[in-house]
C-alpha cells in the first residue's frame, strides 16, 4: 500500500512537470500558436512575391522579344515620339464658377461690385 502512494506521488509530480513544460517551458503552446501565425503570414508573403516575380519575368520576356513593349515604355516613361509624329498635349480648362453658383464659393463675395485697381 505504501509503494502505491509513492508511485502515485511520482506520477503526479511527473504529470505536473510535463504540464508546466507544456504551458510555460520553451516551445510552449503559446509560442507554437505564435509561430503558426508567422508561418501563415510568411506563406502569404511568399505567394505575393511569387506573383510579383512572375509578373516581372513576363515583363522581361516581353521587353526582350517585343518592340511594342519597348515603344510603350519609351513613350510613357521617357516622353519620346517617333520621327514625323506631332505631339499634342491636352490641357483641361479650370471650371469658372457662375455668379449665382454658391457651391463654388472661393472666399469672393460675388454680390458686391468688383473694384478695379488703378
From Swiss-Prot:
Gene Ontology cellular component annotations, sorted alphabetically: cell division site; cell septum; plasma membrane
Top-rank taxon, per record: Bacteria
Transmembrane segments: 7-24
Keyword Membrane: yes
Principal subcellular localisation of the protein: membrane
Cytoplasmic compartment segments: 1-6
Subcellular location: Cell inner membrane
Topological domain spans for side Periplasmic: 25-118
Keywords: Cell cycle, Cell division, Cell inner membrane, Cell membrane, Coiled coil, Membrane, Transmembrane, Transmembrane helix
Feature: compositional bias, Basic and acidic residues: 103-118
Region described as Disordered: 98-118
Bilayer topology term: Single-pass type II membrane protein
Keyword Coiled coil set for record: yes
The family this protein is said to belong to: Belongs to the FtsB family.
Alphabetized PANTHER family for the sequence: CELL DIVISION PROTEIN FTSB
Subunit structure: Part of a complex composed of FtsB, FtsL and FtsQ.
Protein name: Cell division protein FtsB
Amino acid at each position: 500500500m505504501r509503494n502505491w502512494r509513492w508511485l502515485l506521488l511520482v506520477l503526479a509530480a511527473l504529470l505536473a512537470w510535463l504540464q508546466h513544460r507544456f504551458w510555460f517551458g520553451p516551445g510552449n503552446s503559446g509560442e507554437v500558436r505564435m509561430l503558426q501565425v508567422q508561418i501563415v503570414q510568411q506563406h502569404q508573403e511568399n505567394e505575393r512575391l511569387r506573383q510579383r516575380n512572375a509578373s516581372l519575368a513576363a515583363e522581361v520576356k516581353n521587353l526582350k522579344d517585343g518592340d511594342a513593349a519597348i515603344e510603350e515604355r519609351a513613350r510613357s516613361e521617357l516622353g519620346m515620339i517617333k520621327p514625323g509624329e506631332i505631339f499634342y498635349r491636352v490641357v483641361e480648362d479650370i471650371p469658372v464658377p457662375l455668379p449665382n453658383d454658391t457651391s463654388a464659393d472661393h472666399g469672393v463675395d460675388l454680390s458686391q461690385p468688383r473694384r478695379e485697381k488703378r
